[in-house]
Amino acid sequence: MTADAVLPNPAAGVADEVAAYPPAVDLRTMMAKRPLPAVAPGTVDASSLTGEEPARLARRVLDKLNASLAAGDAAGVEECFNASQAYWKDSVALTWHLRTFGTPSTIAASLLETSRLRGLSREGFQVDGDAHFDPMFSFIDCHISFATSSPATKAIGKVLLLPVRGGDGNQVEWKIWILSTRVKSLDVHPENEALLRQPGRAISGEQDFETQTLIVGGGNAAVVLAARLKALGVESVMVERYSQAGDNWARRYGSLQFHVPTSSTQTPFLPYDDSLLGRMLKREDLANHMRRYVAEFHLNILTSSRVQSSVFDTSTKKWTITIKTPAGRVTATARHVVQATGLGSQQPFVPKLADEGLYKGVAIHSTEYQNPEVSLKAKGVRSVLVVGSANTAFDVLQDVHDAGLEVTMVARSATFVFPVEYLDNPLALGAYNTAGAGADEVDRNILSLPTLVEAWLTKGLFASLARAEPEKDR
């Protein structure tokens, strides 16, 4: 097969070059080892699990868990969890990190240590609102809330409880299958959205400055973090290499778009315009929203600038950062430095091929691709080989095809392709479109599941949606 142009996908092969820590794992291998737990038919009477009964049962389990934690009883904590499969997923609430623990013994040891370090309140984990029984999976789904004292926080989460028959085969006990915990707010620094409207600082790039937090980058993560910090009363300054916020999108290829529903990508404090909710976000939508975000909230940003070096002083507990700006070099001092420079997908990876010099056609990386006219047709290209099968590869494939060029995709391994409408299903990311469902509430439900469990549920959902459309080509 020959082609006039070859466009490698930016993500293709990166994993082969950079060692991951923790080591990368194959989700399919994990799924094969850990199927979802099965509840035998007739284990519980669904008709009895209505009204206040699910909440009462959940409260009984939580009371036992709280008592065991207070007593430092590892065996008692372990006994609260489902022996065959259990998870605890924490999002900053108790571990100050994003962690998922497996096996009851590991969960028990980790809960005992972190609840002590964070000062879990005397009340412990409490039922928060209603609980309900899911007849399809036979679990009780219950929201929870709790508080800590070190630091003083309010936190939320949920528990999923499974029915387990006791040793005599008759008695049914409810055990925790999944415990999810997530910090909601800091008591000492509650968010104040009114602070977002206060003027920012005049950062010229000519004078040294001091700030509480220096953020390296000016993309989505950077500007959202800057806004969050400002609402908490914490000053920050972003250092962005391009001439304005949003250029990390605006400078990429013209056909770029998100591959998930817009409603599931909302930004805090300033949502996307309603006119964008019915379609996928495109390059211009993303860039314009970032610029609007910075302007409306008067966020501090130093553009066309790059960090040259950084040194941490252990005595003052401060960073000294040297920054190259259009006006020269300035020095910034900050208590905290946050790197918000993305996942590295814009670092080109081009596989080394034997005798690659023999190929005389156009060979570019997708980071160099603009559009079919400028990047390909103007150079006489008529056929294109796209190497890779991630989102960028499909964007380019569609773009080149629509321009009337012959195009072929080469993928290293099988790629799971499904209709984008599946993602918009109310049981998937379409939950964000549900009338009356706030993003925080949907986040609380969707983000509570361990990745492995979410993978199993998504696989089952997509399989059922596919079975409902037998006329579609597979």
Language-model features: locations:
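Short, low-complexity N-terminal intrinsically disordered segments enriched in polar/charged residues
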Residues: 2-75, 79, 202-205, 209-211
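Conserved N-terminal glycine-rich FAD pyrophosphate-binding loop of Rossmann-like flavoproteins
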Residues: 243-269, 275, 416-436
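Glycine-rich FAD pyrophosphate-binding loop
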Residues: 227-254, 405-418
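Short beta-strand edge/turn micro-motifs at domain boundaries
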Residues: 5-37, 145, 151-204
